[in-house]
Amino acid sequence: MLPKKAGVILLTGASAGVNGYPQSAPFAMGKFALRGLAQSMARELHPQGIHVAHIVVDGGISSARRPVPPDKPDSLLDPNAIADTYLHLIRQPRSAWSWEVEVRPWVEHF
């Protein structure tokens, strides 16, 4: 990436990296550190044409093992919607780079 002065690095965080929660200190510590790493890398690599972004995934993700409850259709994140967010970040023009993005299900409080 450095020789080409182009590239994208995406780091996946969680809401625990933005807000501390009871009984989550070890997890939060790692996610807070990841967010700090993303911010430092973004400032270091931005002048060299490399886009670094931190994505906060704030909610559960639907899967075959964890289907969306029929009575709560918007309670879990759709993995395809998350993938679309990552793809959008990869394709962003340099004139409008995002440094941090939060994705959460529609019913999630913030």
PLM features: what roles do these ranges have?
Residues 1-3, 93:
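A generic alpha-to-beta junction signature in SAM-dependent methyltransferases
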Residues 7-11, 52-55:
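Short beta-strand segments at enzyme active-site cores
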Residues 2, 8-33, 38-39, 43-46, ...:
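Catalytic loop of short-chain dehydrogenase/reductase
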Residues 47-62, 68-110:
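C-terminal helical subdomain
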